[in-house]
């Protein structure tokens, strides 16, 4: 916080901060967020192409339902996708797909 001093930790020109409602978000803050158009395109592609073979294997293990199979599903996903975090996200996505299939 500038106090108008020439040197030191509080050096610099004194300014007043804008209120929160007047501040604009920069484009970089939106980076990585999923837009409506991209989400729709991905959904259509998923409907047309279905699941990859490794995803089908994971779905079968999820349907089995035991803790052992759940761990094996995570291991398969991690092997294919590279990291544990990506594997967890993919497994959650496929679990949601299985739940949607059961509802129909």
Swiss-Prot record:
Family: Belongs to the eukaryotic ribosomal protein eL36 family.
TM region(s), chain numbering: none
Source lineage: Eukaryota, Sar, Alveolata, Ciliophora, Intramacronucleata
InterPro entries: Ribosomal_eL36 (IPR000509), Ribosomal_eL36_sf (IPR038097)
Protein name: Large ribosomal subunit protein eL36
BP terms from Gene Ontology: translation
Superkingdom of this protein's organism: Eukaryota
GO cellular component: a single term: ribonucleoprotein complex
Protein source organism: Tetrahymena thermophila (strain SB210)
Single GO MF annotation: structural constituent of ribosome
Pfam families found in the cross-reference section: Ribosomal_L36e (PF01158)
Keywords: Ribonucleoprotein, Ribosomal protein
């Amino acid at each position: 916080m500038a106090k108008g001093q020439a040197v030191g930790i509080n050096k610099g020109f004194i300014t007043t901060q804008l209120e929160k409602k007047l501040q604009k978000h920069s484009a970089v803050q939106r980076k990585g967020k999923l837009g409506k158009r991209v989400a729709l395109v991905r959904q259509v592609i998923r409907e047309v192409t279905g699941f990859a073979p490794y995803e089908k294997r994971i779905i079968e293990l999820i349907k089995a339902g035991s803790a052992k199979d759940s761990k094996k599903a995570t291991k398969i996903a991690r092997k294919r996708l590279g990291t544990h975090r990506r594997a967890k996200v993919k497994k959650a996505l496929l679990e949601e797909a299985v739940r949607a299939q059961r509802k129909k």
